[in-house]
Amino acid sequence: MQNRNFFEYPKNWIILLIPIFTTFNLLFTSDCYAFPIYAQQNYENPREATGRIVCANCHLAKGPVDIEVPKTVFPDTVFEAVVKIPYDTQIKQVLANGKKGGLNVGAVLILPEGFQLAPSDRIPAEIKEKIGNLAFQPYSEDKKNLLVIGPIPGKTYQEIIFPILSPDPNVNKESNFLKYPIYVGGNRGRGQVYPDGSKSNNNVFNSPATGKITKIVDNKKAGFELSITTVDGSSIVEIIPPGATFLVSEGDSVKIDQPLTTNPNVGGFGQADGEIVLQDPARLQGLLVFLFLVVLAQVFLVLKKKQYEKVQLAEMNF
């Protein structure tokens, strides 16, 4: 009897690929949309016309965020934009597999046109030391003034330092010496909604109907099956992802929209803004010259006044 290779059968290929695809889907799809960097896949611009940053569509809870930038910068200069995403590092979040883990953070920085991520060879050594191994990305190839980062460990990076290069209006005619706004959005922890509208397991799950809970089946990694017998005798099975902590048990009566689980979310998303002035060196030099002339004029005025007082005193003595 002739032996045939396992891979010669198309059916065997399908059997082999199904678990690989499933593993890939669980590892990369479930968690990936929870951070600002993945807004790139769904939105051309991360900031809506209303001023709302699109990360808030998936991160429904709120949390504080702050940004620190210099008040003024000169053209073609590297400076720091510090984004602060504070939270209690002792708390744990529910991961996609239902286990508990630390929180990650992410941020999107919206700079004025012309400002961009500083090239590595332009970043001073002291700023490089602060940045460490962080990898920043432009939001898209044609939007280099929009930067994203994440997910990164929140326990290490509650402050994210972006190295920014200011434009030179003498070279880039689209830039001007003006005061500009800077916007930032930052999150800690996973989101509550995926871009397709489905809920993550980082949510409260409510009863789909009024009735009685007849069964709660723990399918381990696959989550839970909660069966409800409604008032008209029909049965509804609600699938709840892994990691849920139930507020109800078998035999309990529930009403429609009544919470079945606790709220596991410990993270949140926030927005902040700042201002920066792109200063013209020639204007500053002109201001210094003007101030020098004013001081010089004041000195001459004082000297002239003293000279006049001496003349007046001499005439009185005469």
Curated annotation (Swiss-Prot):
<keyword id="KW-0602">Photosynthesis</keyword>
<keyword id="KW-1133">Transmembrane helix</keyword>
<dbReference type="GO" id="GO:0009535">
    <property type="term" value="C:chloroplast thylakoid membrane"/>
</dbReference>
<keyword id="KW-0349">Heme</keyword>
<feature type="binding site" description="covalent">
    <location>
        <position position="58"/>
    </location>
    <ligand>
        <name>heme</name>
    </ligand>
</feature>
<keyword id="KW-0812">Transmembrane</keyword>
<keyword id="KW-0408">Iron</keyword>
<dbReference type="Pfam" id="PF01333">
    <property type="entry name" value="Apocytochr_F_C"/>
</dbReference>
<dbReference type="InterPro" id="IPR011054">
    <property type="entry name" value="Rudment_hybrid_motif"/>
</dbReference>
<comment type="function">
    <text>Component of the cytochrome b6-f complex, which mediates electron transfer between photosystem II (PSII) and photosystem I (PSI), cyclic electron flow around PSI, and state transitions.</text>
</comment>
<keyword id="KW-0813">Transport</keyword>
<dbReference type="InterPro" id="IPR036826">
    <property type="entry name" value="Cyt_f_lg_dom_sf"/>
</dbReference>
<keyword id="KW-0472">Membrane</keyword>
<dbReference type="InterPro" id="IPR002325">
    <property type="entry name" value="Cyt_f"/>
</dbReference>
<dbReference type="InterPro" id="IPR024094">
    <property type="entry name" value="Cyt_f_lg_dom"/>
</dbReference>
<keyword id="KW-0249">Electron transport</keyword>
<comment type="subunit">
    <text>The 4 large subunits of the cytochrome b6-f complex are cytochrome b6, subunit IV (17 kDa polypeptide, petD), cytochrome f and the Rieske protein, while the 4 small subunits are PetG, PetL, PetM and PetN. The complex functions as a dimer.</text>
</comment>
<dbReference type="GO" id="GO:0009055">
    <property type="term" value="F:electron transfer activity"/>
</dbReference>
<feature type="binding site" description="axial binding residue">
    <location>
        <position position="59"/>
    </location>
    <ligand>
        <name>heme</name>
    </ligand>
</feature>
<comment type="similarity">
    <text>Belongs to the cytochrome f family.</text>
</comment>
<keyword id="KW-0150">Chloroplast</keyword>
<protein>
    <recommendedName>
        <fullName>Cytochrome f</fullName>
    </recommendedName>
</protein>
<feature type="signal peptide">
    <location>
        <begin position="1"/>
        <end position="34"/>
    </location>
</feature>
<keyword id="KW-0934">Plastid</keyword>
<dbReference type="GO" id="GO:0015979">
    <property type="term" value="P:photosynthesis"/>
</dbReference>
<keyword id="KW-0732">Signal</keyword>
<dbReference type="InterPro" id="IPR024058">
    <property type="entry name" value="Cyt-f_TM"/>
</dbReference>
<dbReference type="GO" id="GO:0005506">
    <property type="term" value="F:iron ion binding"/>
</dbReference>
<feature type="binding site" description="axial binding residue">
    <location>
        <position position="35"/>
    </location>
    <ligand>
        <name>heme</name>
    </ligand>
</feature>
<keyword id="KW-0793">Thylakoid</keyword>
<dbReference type="Pfam" id="PF16639">
    <property type="entry name" value="Apocytochr_F_N"/>
</dbReference>
<feature type="transmembrane region" description="Helical">
    <location>
        <begin position="284"/>
        <end position="303"/>
    </location>
</feature>
<dbReference type="GO" id="GO:0020037">
    <property type="term" value="F:heme binding"/>
</dbReference>
<feature type="binding site" description="covalent">
    <location>
        <position position="55"/>
    </location>
    <ligand>
        <name>heme</name>
    </ligand>
</feature>
<keyword id="KW-0479">Metal-binding</keyword>
